[in-house]
From Swiss-Prot:
One of its GO terms (molecular function) is metal ion binding. Belongs to the IspF family. Pathway: Isoprenoid biosynthesis; isopentenyl diphosphate biosynthesis via DXP pathway; isopentenyl diphosphate from 1-deoxy-D-xylulose 5-phosphate: step 4/6. Its EC number is 4.6.1.12. The lineage of its organism: Bacteria, Pseudomonadati, Pseudomonadota, Gammaproteobacteria, Thiotrichales. InterPro entries: MECDP_synthase, MECDP_synthase_CS, MECDP_synthase_sf. This is 2-C-methyl-D-erythritol 2,4-cyclodiphosphate synthase. It comes from the Bacteria. Homotrimer.
Amino acid sequence: MSFRIGHGYDVHKFTSTKKNIILGGIEIPYEMGLEAHSDGDVLIHALCDAILGALCLGDIGKHFPDTDMEYKNTDSKFFLAEIKKMLDDKEYSISNIDCTIIAQAPKMLPHIEKMKACLASVLEIQINQINIKATTTEQLGFIGRKEGIATHVVCLLNR
C-alpha cells in the first residue's frame, strides 16, 4: 500500500460588499462575505491544495487561476469535483481529511456537520473520514480583528 500526505492553507479577507460566507460548500449567515475571485470558500480551497499537494500536482491556482474570468464567482465545489477526478485518475483514494478553520467570527460549531456532509458528498467518501474543527486567535492579528478567515487542511491518500 502506498500513502501520500498533503497540506493546504488558504486565507481570505472579509468584505462589506457581500453578506454571508461560503465555507465547506455551505452558506453561513454573517454580516460580511469573503473577498475572492471565486466564491471565497477558504476551506475547499485549502482542501483542494492538500489533495493536489499529495498528488504532486501543484496547487489550485495552477489548475484554476484567479486571472481566468472563466472561474469568476465559481462555486468551489466545482474545483473540488474536478480535483476528485484527478485523484481517481491517479488511482488514489482518501483515507482521511483533517481541517482547521481559524476565525474569530462567525461561530463555526453549528455548521460543522453540514460542512462535513457536503464535502463527503462531493468527494464520494464517508462523513467519518472528515474532521473539521474551529479555533480563534484569541482576538490577535487580522483574524482576531475579524478581518478574515484562514484554514489549514491535511489529507492522507492511499493506493
